From Swiss-Prot:
Residues 29-155 are periplasmic. It comes from Rhizobium etli (strain ATCC 51251 / DSM 11541 / JCM 21823 / NBRC 15573 / CFN 42). GO terms for molecular function: heme binding; metal ion binding. This is Cytochrome c-type biogenesis protein CcmE. The gene is ccmE1. Belongs to the CcmE/CycJ family. The chain crosses the membrane at residues 8-28.
Length: 155
């Protein structure tokens, strides 16, 4: 092999290694991303069962039903006619209550319209609302000035 051919093989090998590393990183990120939806979004574009998502909105009035143990069922609404039934097993945040902003993370079980949440995040205090929820409420004309202030960013 000439010097030129050896150099070409080394460059091709290095580029292949870099490409493989980039593809692995992209695959890892795609597996950990949970897209944000509101009930109206899910009514327009349903997600595949067992796809991990974040569901945000307001806890529906009169929808909280406590089951056996630490199981709780409630609905998440965005102020429209759309509501999504959520089932959560675990300890709810202290600030969780009807009519308050909430972001849940989980997935729809196969063959069910019930969202199985494994994480529930509630409002931080009287003046906080997750940025995603505030943006969606504003875009739908449901945001009321002076009723709360959105956070700068949500992790």
């Amino acid at each position: 092999m000439t010097r030129k051919q050896k150099r070409l093989v080394v460059i091709a090998g290095g580029m292949s290694f870099i490409l493989a590393a980039v593809l692995l990183v992209m695959f890892a990120f795609s597996q950990s991303v949970a897209y944000f939806y509101m009930p109206a979004d899910l009514a327009r574009t349903p997600v595949a069962p067992e796809t991990r998502i974040r569901l945000g909105g307001l806890v529906g009035a009169g929808s909280v039903v406590r089951g056996a143990g630490s199981t709780v069922e409630f609905s998440v609404t965005d102020g429209s006619a759309n509501a999504v039934k959520v089932k959560y097993t675990g300890i709810l945040p202290d600030l969780f209550r009807e009519g308050q902003g909430v972001v849940t993370e989980g997935m729809f079980a196969a063959g069910s319209n019930v969202f199985i949440a494994d994480t529930v995040l509630a409002k931080h205090d009287e003046t906080y609302m997750p940025k995603e929820v505030a943006d969606r409420l504003k875009s739908q004309g449901l945001w009321q000035e002076g009723k709360g202030q959105e956070a700068k960013a949500t992790p």
